[in-house]
Amino acid sequence: MIGKLTGTLLEKNPPEVLVDCHGVGYEVQVSMSTFYNLPAVGERVSLLTQFIVREDAQLLYGFGTAQERQAFRELIKISGVGPRTALSILSGMGVADLAQAVSLQEAGRLVKVPGIGKKTAERLLLELKGKLGADVGVRAHAANDNQADILQALLALGYNDKEAAAALKALPADVGVSEGIKLALKSLSK
């Protein structure tokens, strides 16, 4: 299996890039978020990869972060979601948005991605629950580190993602952690 490629970026044609690794050019499919974070053609690039073998093709998918690759791996385990659809989901919303949609059970956000219908969105929510990493979902709700700490505290106190996110939205953006927790608990007790 090919787990990582490091080499010179030769071509960028979304969603595909060509990476030269010691004289061998690898065609790699990437999500749009990874594509937009790539360096200029001719510069060094490093991509984490997932190698997929099918009857008719051997395909290489590249990712800028370990979280994106892990989300891709979880997505392709789901019935009805192949590599192309998984890449489309990651291109359409990114890992943090996907984790947030899953934690808040928002099928409507997934349906906005081309190729995802209502039934597939519901299946994604069901099968991805708890698999994308709690920290990614928590950080997706929070605008800054203080808000992330407040949200983490509310979750630790037993509030669910929806309740904690709603309480967080009601807080001023510049609130401190201890004051934010007090205000959030007050709003949740109503």
UniProtKB/Swiss-Prot annotation:
GO molecular function, one term: four-way junction helicase activity
Summary of subunit composition and partner proteins: Homotetramer. Forms an RuvA(8)-RuvB(12)-Holliday junction (HJ) complex. HJ DNA is sandwiched between 2 RuvA tetramers; dsDNA enters through RuvA and exits via RuvB. An RuvB hexamer assembles on each DNA strand where it exits the tetramer. Each RuvB hexamer is contacted by two RuvA subunits (via domain III) on 2 adjacent RuvB subunits; this complex drives branch migration. In the full resolvosome a probable DNA-RuvA(4)-RuvB(12)-RuvC(2) complex forms which resolves the HJ.
Protein name in the entry: Holliday junction branch migration complex subunit RuvA
Residue numbers spanned by region Domain III: 142-190
Function: The RuvA-RuvB-RuvC complex processes Holliday junction (HJ) DNA during genetic recombination and DNA repair, while the RuvA-RuvB complex plays an important role in the rescue of blocked DNA replication forks via replication fork reversal (RFR). RuvA specifically binds to HJ cruciform DNA, conferring on it an open structure. The RuvB hexamer acts as an ATP-dependent pump, pulling dsDNA into and through the RuvAB complex. HJ branch migration allows RuvC to scan DNA until it finds its consensus sequence, where it cleaves and resolves the cruciform DNA.
Region spans: Flexible linker: 137-141
Localisation per UniProt entry: Cytoplasm
Gene Ontology BP terms: DNA recombination; DNA repair
Pfam families, sorted: HHH_5, RuvA_C, RuvA_N
CDD domains: UBA_RuvA_C
Gene Ontology CC annotations of this record: cytoplasm; Holliday junction helicase complex; Holliday junction resolvase complex
Main localization of the protein described in the UniProt heading: cytoplasm
Family: Belongs to the RuvA family.
Domain of life: Bacteria
Keywords: Cytoplasm, DNA damage, DNA recombination, DNA repair, DNA-binding
Keyword Isomerase attributed: no
Annotated stretches, region: Domain II: 65-137
Region ranges (Domain I): 1-64
Domain notes: Has three domains with a flexible linker between the domains II and III and assumes an 'L' shape. Domain III is highly mobile and contacts RuvB.
